[in-house]
Amino acid sequence: MKTLLLTLVVVTIVCLDLGYTMQCKTCSFYTCPNSETCPDGKNICVKRSWTAVAGDGLKREIRRECAATCPPSKLGLTVFCCTTDNCNH
């Protein structure tokens, strides 16, 4: 009886997990109040930041999005990847 109960619990957890979809912030602003459901296969939240020339000075740019893989950081580009809902705030 205990084995049957344990099996049912495990199956329930696995089935519930299959329907999970990631929620990430997806915008190009410093403040990002809304989140979106990521499409299938994109279960990583990414936040990229860099400095760009704007007018007579420098401007900090930020982009948040869903991704299938974590892109590499490069010189001048900071990348933060995470795997929980809205973790790329």
From Swiss-Prot:
Instruction: State the source organism's domain of life.
Output: Eukaryota
Q: Is Transport tagged as a keyword? A: no
**Disulfide bridge map:** C24-C45, C27-C32, C38-C66, C70-C81, C82-C87
**Listed GO MF terms:** toxin activity
| Free-text tissue specificity from the UniProt record | Expressed by the venom gland.
Matches recorded under CDD domains: TFP_snake_toxin
Major localization class: secreted
Q: Which keywords describe this protein according to UniProt?
A: Cell adhesion impairing toxin, Disulfide bond, G-protein coupled acetylcholine receptor impairing toxin, G-protein coupled receptor impairing toxin, Hemostasis impairing toxin, Neurotoxin, Platelet aggregation inhibiting toxin, Secreted, Signal, Toxin
Instruction: Please give one Pfam family short name.
Output: Toxin_cobra-type
Signal peptide span per the entry?
1-21
Task: Say which family it is in.
Answer: Belongs to the three-finger toxin family. Ancestral subfamily. Orphan group V sub-subfamily.
| Name this polypeptide is given | Long neurotoxin homolog TA-bm16
